[in-house]
């Protein structure tokens, strides 16, 4: 950091400190108590709705008023008409807080069904007879190829008629001070009401409510009234909001909140609606460091001195404050704005990455371990077959062993230390990590570190739901274009993190020069970008290609891509141009040559075609559900230009190195 940049950063921090208010443990306790009470109210059986009707709401009357305000001509003049509309909207926002669940359902049904999208015939009937006939003549003349002067008033009426009245109503609500928060809360209630009453309502009404939800989402996404700014201790309201709405790492004390908002090289930024200046829609917490952080504890619990040579911008918490924002990409927008702001403040920082939770890992891993005994038996049988063979015929139809969580060395170590039979290691590990105190056994922690880290990598990259990553945090960052950079064991040992993620956290790196490519690869082809170091966790086989990528990583970031292929799916077709080099991480593929043969985990294909620019020689198809790592063709060629070692690699007989790879991998796996 230059002296000028340091002075600017210090001035910003000092200015914030001078105007900051000073809280204490009582202030924190009071706001946390309010937060817990609000959450308890929302989670109550009645959903926090008012049980007794205290304000009147009539669906038919409401529908009629909206139609009069928005669809009919107003003869009182623009100013008076606008004033009446705004007063009506303000009264609704005020009354809605007291609505019962039944009244809220009536309101959304009025908006979705009674004021929903109208067909063209109904829209035409709303036009005066003269305008209607003029429009018909215009359309007929245009259809016959004649030009006819258009009436601007007719065009305006048609345009308004094509916009649902509910959407026009939302636009009106958005212009008043409490409007945006009302719309967010209305969308929260809409989602709850759809789920509660889905089976009771007619199918057409449910579809109309779901369409209304999409209209509200898209309307909020297109509004240009967002403001990006820093959050610090200069505003008590803002500090209290962060305290109550932090979703990832709960604030535990006043000192904790101080560190996050005003600590050395700590920053917090938010996106605000112009009508909600003290309630950010989403906020992110950032720390500047000189390394890729692998634990959340030092960030949350230690007051560090300024880093002399900062190189990394670490995002350790992203919190959305309102579930009415679901389906919107506001958090992504905030991340990119924050990267832009932080790199302008610290231009020497070359790496922007997250330290993120893995909320679904514990459930997935325990379920996998519960089914692990059959995998262990299959693996043991296959290993005995491999030991008795001096040569593996590529044409041999050998069923591959199921993927185990343990290498031979790890299994032997655990057997010697704990006296557990290798065939029941999965059951043994499941029992160990089900103990709430397991993380306090330091010897156990070290002995299972590699097992847990590799398992988490498999979960992050290959656990899918309809081609999308199962883990919601991973799915969010990969859609943004980030890559899985590093898997961290025992990175968060708080009770909640141990319960949901067994202490695992992941670094997702945002490499800005290639972020568009990685984002589109995931959205269009379900390719999850992963660093070579993290890729080795799911493909722990010696590889010249991976070695060369890592050797050149300081000059060029070259991620691999993880993809799941379904059984029977064609991976590469004979005669086509090469697309990638493929690494089989799990499963089995069939090479349909004159003498067909299988490739299993630990093996590769596509090298010769990609490196030599040859067409694909044989069709390769997934025989089972198969997990692959890909190095795209363009990256292969770029790597080839910079690495002479690849020429020797591709020059060998493919069957020889396929057999060597198979033996090197399966000889060390259960």
Segments from the language model and where they lie:
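Extended, composition-driven regions rather than compact fold-specific motifs
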Residues: 2-547, 670
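Short acidic, glycine-rich loop/turn motifs
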Residues: 273-277, 591-593, 622
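Conserved beta-strand elements of beta-rich interaction domains across eukaryotes
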Residues: 276, 359, 513, 588-589, ...
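A generic structural signal for short coil/turn motifs at secondary-structure boundaries
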Residues: 323-327, 573, 608, 638-640
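Short, surface-exposed beta-strand-loop junctions and turns on beta-sheet-rich folds
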Residues: 492, 590, 597-598, 635-638
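Regulatory nucleotide-sensing modules
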Residues: 545-612, 616-618
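A conserved hydrophobic position in a structured secondary element of the catalytic/binding core
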Residues: 584, 600, 623, 631-632
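A small-molecule sensor/coupling module
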Residues: 610, 615-621, 627, 633-670
């Amino acid at each position: 950091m230059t002296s000028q940049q340091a002075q600017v950063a210090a001035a910003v921090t000092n200015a914030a400190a001078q105007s900051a208010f000073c809280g204490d443990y009582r202030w924190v306790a009071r706001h946390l108590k309010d937060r817990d009470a609000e959450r308890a109210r929302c989670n109550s059986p009645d959903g926090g709705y008012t049980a007794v009707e205290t304000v009147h709401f009539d669906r038919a009357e409401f529908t009629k008023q909206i139609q009069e305000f928005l669809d009919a001509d107003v003869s009182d003049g623009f100013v008076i008409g606008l004033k009446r509309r705004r007063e009506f909207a303000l009264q609704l926002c005020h009354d809605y807080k007291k609505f019962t669940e039944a009244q809220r359902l009536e309101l959304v049904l009025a908006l979705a069904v009674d004021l929903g999208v109208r067909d063209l015939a109904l829209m035409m009937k709303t036009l005066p007879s003269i305008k209607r006939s003029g429009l018909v003549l215009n359309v007929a003349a245009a259809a016959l190829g004649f030009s006819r002067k258009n009436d601007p008033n007719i065009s305006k009426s048609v345009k308004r008629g094509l916009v649902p009245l509910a959407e026009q109503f939302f636009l009106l609500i958005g212009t008043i001070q409490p409007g945006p928060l009302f719309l967010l809360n209305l969308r929260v209630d809409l989602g709850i009401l759809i789920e509660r009453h889905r089976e009771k309502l007619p199918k057409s009404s449910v579809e109309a409510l779901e369409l209304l939800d999409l209209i509200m989402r898209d309307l909020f996404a297109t509004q240009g009234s967002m403001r990006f700014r820093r959050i610090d201790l200069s505003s008590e309201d803002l500090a209290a909001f962060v305290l109550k709405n932090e979703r990832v790492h709960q604030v535990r004390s006043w000192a904790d909140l101080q560190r996050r908002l005003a600590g050395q090289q700590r920053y917090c930024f938010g996106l605000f609606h112009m009508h909600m200046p003290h309630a950010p829609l989403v906020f992110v917490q950032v720390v500047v460091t000189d390394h890729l952080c692998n634990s959340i504890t030092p960030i949350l619990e230690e007051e560090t001195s300024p880093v002399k040579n900062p190189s990394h911008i670490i995002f350790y918490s992203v919190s959305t404050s309102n579930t009415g924002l679901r389906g919107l990409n506001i958090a992504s927008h905030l991340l990119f704005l924050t990267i832009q702001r932080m790199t302008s403040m610290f231009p020497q920082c070359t790496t922007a990455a997250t330290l993120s939770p893995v909320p679904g890992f514990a459930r997935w891993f325990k379920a996998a371990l519960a089914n692990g005994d059959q995998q262990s038996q299959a693996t043991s049988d296959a290993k005995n077959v491999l030991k008795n063979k001096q040569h593996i015929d590529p044409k041999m139809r050998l069923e591959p062993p199921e993927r185990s969580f343990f290498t031979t060395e790890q299994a032997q170590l655990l057997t010697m230390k704990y006296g557990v039979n290798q065939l029941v290691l999965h059951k043994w590990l499941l029992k160990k990590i089900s103990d709430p105190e397991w993380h306090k056994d330091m010897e156990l922690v070290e002995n299972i570190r590699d097992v847990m880290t590799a398992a988490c990598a498999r979960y992050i990259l290959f656990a899918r739901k309809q081609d999308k990553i199962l883990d919601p945090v991973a799915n969010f960052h990969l859609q943004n274009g980030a890559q899985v950079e590093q898997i961290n064991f025992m990175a968060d040992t708080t009770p909640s993190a141990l319960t949901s993620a067994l202490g695992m956290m992941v670094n997702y790196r945002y490499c800005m020069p290639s972020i568009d490519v990685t984002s589109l690869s995931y959205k269009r082809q379900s390719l999850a970008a992963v660093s070579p170091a993290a890729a080795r966790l799911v493909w722990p086989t010696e590889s010249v290609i991976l070695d060369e990528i890592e050797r050149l990583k300081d000059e060029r970031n070259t991620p691999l891509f993880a993809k799941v292929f379904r059984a029977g799916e064609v991976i590469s077709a004979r005669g086509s141009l090469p697309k990638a080099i493929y690494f089989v991480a799990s499963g089995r593929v069939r090479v349909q040559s004159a003498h067909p043969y299988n490739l299993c985990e630990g093996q590769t294909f596509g090298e010769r075609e990609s490196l030599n620019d040859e067409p694909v020689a044989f069709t390769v198809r997934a025989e089972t559900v198969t997990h692959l790592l890909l190095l795209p063709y363009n990256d292969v060629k770029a790597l080839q230009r910079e690495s002479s070692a690849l020429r020797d690699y591709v020059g060998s007989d493919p069957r020889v190195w396929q057999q060597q790879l198979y033996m090197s991998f399966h000889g060390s796996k259960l």
